[in-house]
C-alpha cells in the first residue's frame, strides 16, 4: 500500500499525547501506516452502506458521524484522507467533503488513542522516546482502550 499520509501531522498527533517524551520518525511512520489501513477499511464499510442505500456518494453518515466537526479543528489534512478513502473502494464511488472531514475526525481520534497508549508504554519501559515498537505493541495488547 502506497503511503498517502505525510508523517508531519501524525508526528504532531503523537507529540500532543507524548507529554515530555520525544517521538522517533519511525513511530510517526508506523502510526501513519496504521491510520491509512484503518481509514481504507472504514471507507470500504462506508461504501457498502452507501451501496445498500442506493447511492454512489459516501456521506458522513456512512461513517457513523452525525455532527461533522470544523475541518480547521483537525490535525490531519483532508486531501490525503480523501486518497486514503479511495484506496480500496471502486472508482464509481464519490466521497463528499463532509465524509472526508468525518473520516479525518475518526482517524484522528484513533491516532490519539494509539499515541496515548504508546506514550504510556514508553514511560513504562523507562524510555524518553516513543518508538515504532510502542505503536506496534499497542496492537499486540489483548485489551485496548
Segments (PLM) and residue ranges:
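Intrinsically disordered, low-complexity terminal regions
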Residues: 1-145
Amino acid at each position: 500500500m502506497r503511503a498517502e499520509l505525510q508523517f508531519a501531522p501524525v508526528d504532531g498527533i503523537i507529540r500532543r499525547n507524548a507529554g515530555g517524551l520525544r517521538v522517533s520518525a519511525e513511530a510517526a511512520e508506523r502510526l501513519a501506516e496504521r491510520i491509512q489501513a484503518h481509514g481504507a477499511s472504514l471507507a470500504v464499510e462506508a461504501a457498502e452502506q452507501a451501496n445498500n442505500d442506493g447511492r454512489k456518494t459516501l456521506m458522513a453518515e456512512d461513517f457513523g458521524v452525525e455532527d461533522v466537526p470544523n475541518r480547521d479543528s483537525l490535525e490531519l489534512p483532508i486531501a490525503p484522507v480523501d486518497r486514503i478513502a479511495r484506496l480500496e473502494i471502486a472508482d464509481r464511488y464519490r466521497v463528499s467533503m463532509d465524509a472526508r472531514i468525518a473520516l479525518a475526525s475518526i482517524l484522528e481520534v484513533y491516532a490519539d488513542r494509539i499515541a496515548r497508549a504508546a506514550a504510556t508504554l514508553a514511560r513504562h519501559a523507562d524510555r524518553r522516546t516513543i518508538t515504532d515498537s510502542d505503536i506496534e505493541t499497542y496492537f499486540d495488547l489483548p485489551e485496548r482502550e
